[in-house]
Regions:
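C-terminal amphipathic alpha-helical segment
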Residues: 276-343
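Short beta-strand segments
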Residues: 162, 238-239, 275, 385-387
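Catalytic or ion-translocation cores adjacent to nucleophile or general acid/base/metal-coordination motifs
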Residues: 242-304
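Active-site beta-strand/loop microenvironment that shapes enzyme catalytic pockets
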Residues: 215-259
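Charged substrate- and nucleic-acid-binding regions of tRNA-handling and nucleotidyl-transfer enzymes
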Residues: 345-427
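Metal-assisted phosphate- and nucleotidyl-transfer catalytic regions
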Residues: 222-225, 311-326, 362-365, 378-381
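N-terminal extension/subdomain marker
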Residues: 1-192, 200, 223-226, 390-404, ...
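Glycine-rich phosphate-binding "P-loop"
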Residues: 189-211, 335-338
Length: 427
């Protein structure tokens, strides 16, 4: 691997790009989107038809628990082998790709495609790895995904890693330099996904990326941004696709068990293709995810809340404050002197405990203030509207608390998620 990147866990990769006359039919949205909308995936099938497509190389998770999943996986693996044998792909050796993704709202998100060393990724809460999960990893979700990946010849990435680069030193300088790069693709994305353009970095640009990435994890940078010069540096936080990255890690760990240690470094499966995005990219938006409780007695909940957090009170004030709606209790609940970094964390710990003691109470995770207020105001329900987590809170919270509470925030609309376009051999 390129020694210039040794301190970063992020490397140039041998990236495969399709050579097809119908490029618009190749990219397809991340497999973990539209999981309750099979109509979307049927529309994707219709859009692709018989043309070569990444749709033939991934398993939409809407089908993950279906009765024919084993047959689907066999078909995917056969399609990978056929595309490789037919010479469908062009290989870009030891490359990084700069991309500009025009989202459905017209804003442009900037990214960098390369691979990460899975030895430097750990989803365990409290890990000191360079690459960490932002939310808890549900271990039960990994084995079904391992079945999809373990015999696959290729990987196609929908993992998005975030860097905390407020000075915009790593990716943004590339925006004005595309004229000296090799243009790779320029295509619309099916079913309202916007548009994407990609360019191959020059050698000197890769050197600069290596240097600026390394600088982000220096003790000086850690002290300046977080006041944590002695903390284990966090360079990449997983924004999207954590269970996909955890699956890649599990497959690599399984291979290590049957491979001599001296060969681990040469295993293609040791690395995973990802897109890196700056947390401070203007097109990257965080939206809060609210909570609505069903079949709940609001007065009992408030009594339990006060018992759980002595000193909690209605109305605003110092500490963590959440808006409550429903059952004539509209207003604010405040917890002074909270231990968690985020209001979401303070509330979630309580809700988890309360729901264990009251199994009849159900919690749903709701996008949008108006929807949460409408649902929370129905009889028997209670809504909690939570404040938006600032981007600047993400990295310090992961470093201090290990992971964020589940369903803390969402990053954009489903159709603005990564589309599969690039590929890489993992066998």
């Amino acid at each position: 691997m390129d020694q210039r990147f040794e301190q970063t866990a992020f490397y140039p990769a041998d990236i495969l790009l399709p050579q097809t006359a119908e490029m618009k039919k190749w990219p397809v949205v991340a497999c973990d989107q539209f999981t309750s909308q099979p109509d979307y995936w049927q529309a994707a099938e219709a859009a692709v038809g018989e043309a070569p497509s990444a749709l033939r190389l991934v398993l939409p998770e809407v089908y993950l628990n279906g009765p024919d999943v084993d047959k689907r996986i066999e078909t995917i693996n056969a399609s990978m082998d056929r595309y490789l044998a037919d010479g469908l792909f062009r290989t870009l050796p030891d490359s990084l790709i700069y991309l500009e993704r025009t989202q459905s709202d017209g804003r442009v998100r900037h990214g960098l495609i390369g691979c990460v060393d899975l030895e430097q990724y750990d989803f365990t809460p409290g890990s000191g790895a360079l690459i960490r999960a932002t939310e808890g990893t549900v271990l039960e979700r990994i084995p079904p995904r391992v079945r999809v990946r373990e015999h696959a010849a290729l990987e196609l990435p929908h993992v998005m890693l975030l860097i905390d680069d407020p000075q915009r030193s790593v990716i943004e300088p590339l925006t004005g330099e595309t004229g000296v790069m090799e243009a790779l693709y320029d295509t619309d994305l099916m079913l309202g996904g916007g548009h994407v353009k990609g360019w191959r970095l020059t050698d000197s640009q890769m050197s600069r990326v290596a240097n600026t990435l390394s600088a982000l994890k220096s003790p000086e940078a850690m002290a300046d941004k977080y006041g944590m010069a002695d903390a284990a540096p966090l360079l990449f936080a997983v924004g999207d696709g954590n269970h996909s990255l955890a699956t890649a890690k599990a497959c690599y760990e399984n291979l290590k068990k049957v491979t001599p240690p001296e060969r681990w470094a040469s295993l293609p499966a040791r690395y995973a293709l990802v897109e890196v995005v700056n947390l401070h990219d203007d097109a990257l938006t965080f939206e809060p995810i609210h909570r609505v409780l069903f079949h709940v007695d609001g007065r009992d909940l408030w009594d339990a809340f006060q018992a759980f957090y002595p000193g909690a009170h209605t109305g605003g004030g110092e500490g963590h404050t959440a808006e409550v709606c429903g059952q004539g209790m509209d207003g604010l609940w405040t917890v002074p002197h909270p231990k968690a970094q985020l209001t979401m964390g303070t509330l979630q710990v309580f809700l988890d405990a309360y729901c264990r003691d009251h199994p009849e109470v159900q919690v749903d995770y709701i996008h949008g203030d108006d929807v949460a207020r409408k649902l929370g105001s129905r009889p028997g329900n209670l809504g909690f509207l939570l404040p938006l987590m600032g981007k600047e809170q993400l990295f310090p919270t992961v470093m201090a608390d290990g992971v964020l509470p589940r369903k803390t925030f969402s990053m954009g609309e489903a159709r603005d998620k990564r589309y599969y376009l690039e590929a890489r051999r993992i066998r």
